[in-house]
Amino acid sequence: MEWHSKFSGPNTSPGFLLWQATQSWQRKVGKALAEFDLTHVQFVLLTSCKYMIAHGETVTQKKLASFSQTNIMMVSEVVRTLEKKGFIERSKNPQDKREVLLSLTEIGGEKVTAALPIVEKIDQAFFAAAMKKENFLSGLQELLKHE
């Protein structure tokens, strides 16, 4: 069977390398978050919600999906799970009954406060070598601009 690719192999394919790095990073974060009864996605949405609230934003599922650049249907499912766990509360917007507002419970806020430093420590260790490279963060930011 012949191999036809612009890249000489997996180690020169940026997409494949990004995929592998993402999988490795997510495994490390997921393992650490298990002790908090959170998946990586739950942590990201819970932390994003807390960040948005702390910065004076009214949080809806649509705004949370936009902020975290995730699918609205997935956000809806994850928020439902976080609500069942007692980490998030949903309520109707008094100004617009069609809109559901999100807020963190005390327990949800405590989960973020406890888990965030651990995830940040993992991020620092995992990305340390790449952060030494000039333009690493700006390169990632540039990738997100073209979505």
UniProtKB/Swiss-Prot annotation:
Boundaries of every HTH marR-type domain copy: 11-147
InterPro entries membership: HTH_MarR-typ, MarR/SlyA-like, WH-like_DNA-bd_sf, WH_DNA-bd_sf
Keywords: DNA-binding, Transcription, Transcription regulation
GO biological process, one term: regulation of DNA-templated transcription
SUPFAM superfamilies: Winged helix' DNA-binding domain
DNA-binding interval(s): 61-84
Coiled coil: none
GO terms for MF: DNA binding; DNA-binding transcription factor activity
Transcription found in the keyword field: yes
Entry protein name: Uncharacterized HTH-type transcriptional regulator YdcH
Organism name: Bacillus subtilis (strain 168)
